[in-house]
Swiss-Prot record:
Protein family (similarity comment): Belongs to the HpcH/HpaI aldolase family.
GO molecular function: 4-hydroxy-2-ketopimelate aldolase activity; metal ion binding
Top-level taxon in the UniProt lineage: Bacteria
Record-given protein name: 4-hydroxy-2-oxo-heptane-1,7-dioate aldolase
Source organism per UniProt: Shigella flexneri
Entries under Pfam families matching the protein: HpcH_HpaI
Length: 267
């Protein structure tokens, strides 16, 4: 039950990831094969639920790629269910301050360190109580990544970084750019300056900085600055753009021209 993704972040080894939004165990297993270090199962913007997350965790399990799960919200009940089906690494969206970061951490810990309910006899996470001392070991293997996606969260970043149990901080460039007044343009110089400053600040605090960006040049720039978990693509976008390009090569250029309008997108 060792969380190798958490261990890699702690050791300072950069982890390259891919975003999963197709909500399919079949495509999740397909994408566990190319060699990405981690795969993000998105429960915030993709049509996932606990059952679909479970099937994707099962599909990814035989492969080296490590699953990270994003719940729809910083909700202890939802987090409890995701942990019980086997999630060990969570990416918690829209964390605005230290109190919300503490709430996320406490939701992943059994008492007295937190509020996670004990139901290991029913849980895939404990292999239905077949893992010896699971209740004693589980807390240390939980990896909590919190998302900062607004100017308020950026302002509160020093306090968020002080929260014990926060392993990493993920900068959400799409929502951050919108909050800064540059919706759809995360590559705006002001947004980029804020992102770069945050990456350095997070790393200096001994936490792991993370981000999603499909622009290869920017992804490499963030890695140079010290980002440790970087998602470099999204399954839905990869499929859509490849299909559009194939159609265009056979004379249908309408869909590919529409895609070209979104060159500044995170995805």
């Amino acid at each position: 039950m060792e969380n190798s993704f958490k261990a890699a972040l702690k050791a300072g080894r950069p982890q390259i990831g891919l975003w999963l939004g197709l909500s399919s165990s079949y495509s999740a297993e397909l994408l566990a094969g190319p060699g990405f270090d981690w795969l993000l199962i998105d429960g915030e913007h993709a049509p996932n639920n606990v059952q679909t997350v479970l099937t994707q965790l099962q599909a990814i399990a035989p492969y080296p790629s490590q699953p990270v799960v994003r719940p729809s919200w910083n909700d202890p009940v939802q987090i409890k269910q995701l942990l019980d089906v086997g999630t060990q690494t969570l990416l918690v969206p829209m964390v605005q301050n230290a109190d919300e970061a503490r709430k996320a951490v406490r939701a992943t810990r059994y008492p007295p360190a937190g509020i996670r309910g004990v139901g290991s006899a029913l849980a895939r996470a404990s292999r239905w109580n077949r893992i010896p001392d699971y209740l004693q070991k589980a807390n240390d293997q939980m990896c909590v990544l919190v998302q900062i996606e607004t100017r308020e969260a950026m302002k509160n970043l020093p306090q968020i970084l002080d929260v014990e149990g926060v392993d990493g901080v993920f900068i959400g460039p799409a929502d951050l750019s919108a909050d800064m007044g540059y919706a759809g343009n995360p590559q705006h110089p002001e947004v980029q300056a804020a992102i770069e400053q945050a990456i350095v600040q997070i790393r200096e605090a001994g936490k792991a900085p993370g981000i999603l960006i499909a622009n290869e040049q920017l992804a490499k720039r963030y890695l140079e600055l010290g980002a440790l978990f970087v998602a470099v693509g999204v399954d839905t976008t990869l499929l859509a753009r490849a299909a559009e390009a194939l159609a265009a090569r056979f004379g249908n250029s309408s869909s590919i021209s529409m895609a070209k309008q979104n060159n500044n997108s995170v995805y």
